[in-house]
Every structure is written in structure tokens, then in C-alpha cells.
Regions:
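A hydrophobic alpha-helical transmembrane-helix feature that marks the membrane cores
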Residues: 1-234
């Protein structure tokens, strides 16, 4: 379960230039698409080339997860201080590493199921993004509740993995986490307007920050839908 939040943004009731806002939204979704495309290609190559075996047997899996987490932390904590080039490099580095870790999806689920549910996830994500974009209401108050639910979901998932080991609880958690990220997508899309009005953020890189947020939202929605409805390999 992955995401991070920056609630230090100004009230998005400020009137902004719609052409500028639309430009930022366009760049955001373009960068998000590039990240997802890169992750998908890397994931498929890692699995079908057999590289996944070398990674697991060689003990590199835990290292990749640590590096992946480190990149997210650096990205979120140092975003304001980093240059647009550095931010872009971190974003693509994360999407590439995440592509490697996502290769297990191909090992667990049938390809037809992966493709079809990816499309379903994309349609749901697009609808939620549209709602967040068109909503004029300030949704910044959602941030606290989202963080609480995400932390609770993470803790319960870890407890279920090592202690409870309940498939029933696992399914319930999948539904809860999915519901949370559906709300997160609306929240993050709406937050782009507020970020546009934050004078402390470089407009040359804010779209990359937003792309990372939405990338994480989509990946989590897709993984939850795949876990609930995906057809597993025999």
C-alpha cells in the first residue's frame, strides 16, 4: 500500500487561470501515463525474461523494496528543494523499480484477467479524476481521514499477514483499501488546483509531483481490484 500526502497547501478557493490549470492537468496525466507505461513494460519483461527468478533467488527483492521506499521518502520530503530534472529522474526511477516489483502480478494472475481489470481500473480512475477535477468544493479536510484509514489498513494488513492469516479478513481489507483509494483519487485530483495556487511550489515541476500522486493512486486501485476479481493461474 503506497501513498504520501502534503497537506501544506493553500485553500483552493482562490480564482486561478483556467488555461494554466488545464495545462498542468494535461502535463500531470501525460507524466502519469509515461510512468505507468514504463512500469508495465518493465514488469512484463522482468517476468517473461525469467529475470524474476534471478531477483528472488539472488536476494535482491528486499533491496528493491527498500530502495523503492527510499525514493518515495526522498521525493516527498525533498520535493520543494529538488530541481525539476531531479524530480523527474526520481519519478521515473520509482516507476521503473516499481515495475520490477509488480512483475509478480504476471506470476499470480492470468494475462487476460490482468489486461481486462487494468482497463476497468483505468475507466474507474478516469471517472473519479473527472469528479475531482470538476468539484469546486475544497476537499482538503479529507486529508486527515484518508491518512487515518490508510495507516489503519496498513497495520491490519501486516497483522493479518503475520498473525491472523485470515483469507476472509484479507478480502474485507481489499474492499476497504479500494474504497479509500477511490476517495483518495478524487482528493488528489482536486488538490492539483490548490497546489497550483501555492507560491512556494515551482510550476515547472508541480505536474511531476501530481503525476506521482495519481500514479500511486491508480496502482493501488488496480492491485485491489485485481486481488478481488482477478483470475489466478492454476
Amino acid at each position: 500500500m503506497q501513498n504520501f500526502y502534503d497537506d501544506n497547501v493553500q485553500d483552493n478557493n482562490v480564482i486561478i487561470d483556467k488555461s494554466t490549470e488545464n495545462k498542468i492537468f494535461g502535463k500531470t496525466f501525460f507524466w502519469m501515463f509515461l510512468g505507468l507505461l514504463g512500469s508495465a513494460i518493465i514488469a512484463a519483461y522482468t517476468y517473461y525474461s525469467g529475470l524474476i527468478v534471478d531477483i528472488v533467488v539472488g536476494g535482491s527483492w528486499s533491496v528493491l523494496l527498500i530502495v523503492e521506499l527510499a525514493v518515495v521518502i526522498i521525493f516527498s520530503l525533498c520535493f520543494r528543494k529538488l530541481s525539476p530534472t531531479a524530480v523527474g529522474i526520481l519519478y521515473f526511477l520509482y516507476s521503473m523499480i516499481n515495475g520490477v516489483t509488480l512483475c509478480t502480478v504476471f506470476a499470480v494472475y492470468e494475462l487476460n484477467s490482468i489486461v481486462s481489470l487494468f482497463m476497468v481500473s483505468a475507466l474507474i480512475f478516469a471517472a473519479l479524476g473527472y469528479i475531482g477535477y470538476k468539484t469546486d468544493k475544497d476537499l482538503s479536510s479529507w486529508g486527515t481521514y484518508i491518512s487515518i484509514f490508510l495507516i489503519a489498513g496498513l497495520v491490519l494488513s501486516v497483522l493479518n499477514l503475520f498473525i491472523f492469516k485470515s483469507s476472509g479478513l484479507d478480502l474485507i481489507l481489499d474492499w476497504i483499501i479500494l474504497a479509500v483509494f477511490l476517495g483518495v483519487t478524487i482528493y488528489d485530483t482536486n488538490k492539483i488546483k490548490a497546489l497550483e495556487n501555492d507560491p512556494s511550489i515551482d510550476t515547472n515541476k508541480v505536474h511531476i509531483y501530481c503525476a506521482m500522486q495519481l500514479y500511486l493512486d491508480f496502482i493501488n486501485i488496480f492491485l485491489r481490484i485485481l486481488s478481488i476479481f482477478g483470475k489466478r493461474r492454476d
